[in-house]
Amino acid sequence: MTAIRVPRRRASADLQGGFDFSRPDEIVCGVDEAGRGPLAGPVVAAAVILDPARPIDGLDDSKALSAKKRDALYDLIVARASAFCVASASVDEIDTLNILHATMLAMKRAVEGLSVLPTLAQIDGNRCPTLTVRAEAIVSGDALVPSISAASILAKVTRDRMLVDLHERFPVYGFNMHVGYSTPQHLAALREHGPCEVHRRSFAPVREALDLMAGSR
């Protein structure tokens, strides 16, 4: 695994698709995750191989985009990518493995689920999962490499939609508003109602809410 730190700028035109034209035999997939920090729900990862013949304008780090723009780009990525896969690691896996290892597992599942076998996986961040293909970590890759940007959008939109669905089952927590992050509203609901089955018990605020509920009995 290699880790690359590059200046924060957009990738060149030669890197706009899933093929690196300076290395014409490469099939490159971008990989990113969503949901490492929240107190509830799975961590989701996506892998994307872009089609250089079907470019997508406006790709960027999902966190820099509005929800409306993310949704529009999500549809374009799904329609135009050469291949993509979205995968996750469950709350139980997060609590058993820890969030870092669960994130690596979700990324591995996403890459292995691609219908096209890449020769290189470019991972956002400074760590790579263990893969059967070559991998390199790119710091701030979600803002620099279009295929990683695309992966960040698929992962973020997918996870946000999962949490909106979970809101229907557990409405007292407001998952539709904060998608599991530790907002004041979420923390107050945790203290009042205690955790539900989709809360990550390995995370300190959830453990504290459990202790509070146990102490009040």
Curated annotation (Swiss-Prot):
The lineage of its organism: Bacteria, Pseudomonadati, Pseudomonadota, Betaproteobacteria, Burkholderiales. Residues 26-215 form the RNase H type-2 domain. One of its GO terms (molecular function) is manganese ion binding. Keywords: Cytoplasm, Endonuclease, Hydrolase, Manganese, Metal-binding, Nuclease. The keyword Protein biosynthesis does not apply. NCBIfam families: PRK00015.1-3, PRK00015.1-4. It is found in: Cytoplasm. Its cofactor is Mn(2+); Mg(2+). HAMAP family: RNase_HII_B. GO terms for biological process: DNA replication, removal of RNA primer; mismatch repair. This is Ribonuclease HII. The gene is rnhB. It catalyses: Endonucleolytic cleavage to 5'-phosphomonoester.
